[in-house]
Each structure stands twice: as C-alpha cells, then as structure tokens.
C-alpha cells in the first residue's frame, strides 16, 4: 500500500501542529503548511515536510499545491482545513473591514483551497476533506461575534458540500471542538488591538471587567479544556474509518451544547450561556 498523503493548513501551533506530528508518526506523508516562513523553517527542523501557504493568497495556494502534487505524483488523499483566527470584541465595535479580513481566512480561503483540491480527488477516485469547525459554529458566546459568524458559515458550507459530494468518492467531515489547548487567545490579541477601539466603546467598562482580563491575563485552562491531541484522535477516525460520521464533537461542552441547542427554547439557552 502506498503512503497516504495529507495537506494540513494552520500548522504553526495547536490543532494543526499536533495533527501534523501525529499523522507523520502514524506513517502519513504530511504536508504541514503555515503562513509565516519562520514557522515553516521551525517545522522543517522538527522533521516535517513543511511549506508556506497563505489561505488569503491565491498565488500562495497555487504554488504550495503545485509543489505538493509534484512531490506525490499528482495525488492527495486528504485535506484538513484548519487555519483560522479570532477577532474578539462586541459586535457593535467590530469594523466591517475586520469582518471581511476574518472571513478571508476562516471561510473564503478554505473554500478556495477546497475548490483546488476537489478536482484532484475526483480524478483519482477518492479523497477526504476534513473541516475544523467549533462549538461556536452552533452556539454563541459574548465577545465572539466575528469568529462565531465565520464558524456558523463554515457549518452551513460544510453541510452543503457534504450533500453535493454524495455522488462522488470524496467524503466531507466536520469536526467541532470545544475548548482546546492552543494559542488562539494569544494570537487574537493583535487583531483585537488593530481593530477594536474598546476605550471609546459604550461598553468600555464591560471590556475592562471581562474581555481585557481574558485576553491579557493568564487565567489557566478552561474547566473542560482538552489538549489538541483530543482533536487529532477524531481526525484519525475521520481519515481511517470506512464510513466516518459526518460530524464529530470534541470536549464535553461541544457535545452538551449540541444537545441543548436542540431541546431548549432560545431564551432558556441564552440564560444558560450567560450564566456560564
């Protein structure tokens, strides 16, 4: 059996980083991609086959995919769309430009790369596309409007793509993690500082008491937080199972909220989320 190949986006840390190393150790030919050249160099020094890929840049995507296909002889078994970031802030304080920027990475870039990979998989007669969603793709929390909007959109996009791909040999899977050990909070700070003029907001006092503490103080792990390896375990199922579940959930909050959103009235769910 020939070595299976997988392209993973967003491998500099967190879920993508753990998945790249774990799949490599399991015998996959992993193409670990990052936006920054220094991260590519770091992963290369760690023994991974790393490439630079910016999902907001068509030329970057074309170049990386072309290089990958040249190395594999034109085949690619799997794509894991993981690259994403957050821009925290109250919805009324988020400039439209900030919303456009986050959609470019979290959805539009994912869509563009997926479109480039589907013809390869259709031609070879097999393939798996795994999108990394979030518990915030089906429930909401304050201060997360921009990220929530992209993940809700990804949920609908993935559902539609899955139905459309039913008549092809390409399987589409969505993994929705809850709180996972990663650098998403730290990585969100530059986006917050770039776009959110919190001190001029009518919610300035709420920012001081809540969001600023979350962003700038190390408050330790969330109560139900799991390591990135918990997501990787689901990725192995998504890639190896003959008929994997179309949606998978990671962490207790992800499972629980998926049930509660279906059974609770909106006001009751709002109350529960606010209380939590």
Name each region found by the language model.
Residues 114, 150:
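Active-site helix of classical SDR
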């Amino acid at each position: 059996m020939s070595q299976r190949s997988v392209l993973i986006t967003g491998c500099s840390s967190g879920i993508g980083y753990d998945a790249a190393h774990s799949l490599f150790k399991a015998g996959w030919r992993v193409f670990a991609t990052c936006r920054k050249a220094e991260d590519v160099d770091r992963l290369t020094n760690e023994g991974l086959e790393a490439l630079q890929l910016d999902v907001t840049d068509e030329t970057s995507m074309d170049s990386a995919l072309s290089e990958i296909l040249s190395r594999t002889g034109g085949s690619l078994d799997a794509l894991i769309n993981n690259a994403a970031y957050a821009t925290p802030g109250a919805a009324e304080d988020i400039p439209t430009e900030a919303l456009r920027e986050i959609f470019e990475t979290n959805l539009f870039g994912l869509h563009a790369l997926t479109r480039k990979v589907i013809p390869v998989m259709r031609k070879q007669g097999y393939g798996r596309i795994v999108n990394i969603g979030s518990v915030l793709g089906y429930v909401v929390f304050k201060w997360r409007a921009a990220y929530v909007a992209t993940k809700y959109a990804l949920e609908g996009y993935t559902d539609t793509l899955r139905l459309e791909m039913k008549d092809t040999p390409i399987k589409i899977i969505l993994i929705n993690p809850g709180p996972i050990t990663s650098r998403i909070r730290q990585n969100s700070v530059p986006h917050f500082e770039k776009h959110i003029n919190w001190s001029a907001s009518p919610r300035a006092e709420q920012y001081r008491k809540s969001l600023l503490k979350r962003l700038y103080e190390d408050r330790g792990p969330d109560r139900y937080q799991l390591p990135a390896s918990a997501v990787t375990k689901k990725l192995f199922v998504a890639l190896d199972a003959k008929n994997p579940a179309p949606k998978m959930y990671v962490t207790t909050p992800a499972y629980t909220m998926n049930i509660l959103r279906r059974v609770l009235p909106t006001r009751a769910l709002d109350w529960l989320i606010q209380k939590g």
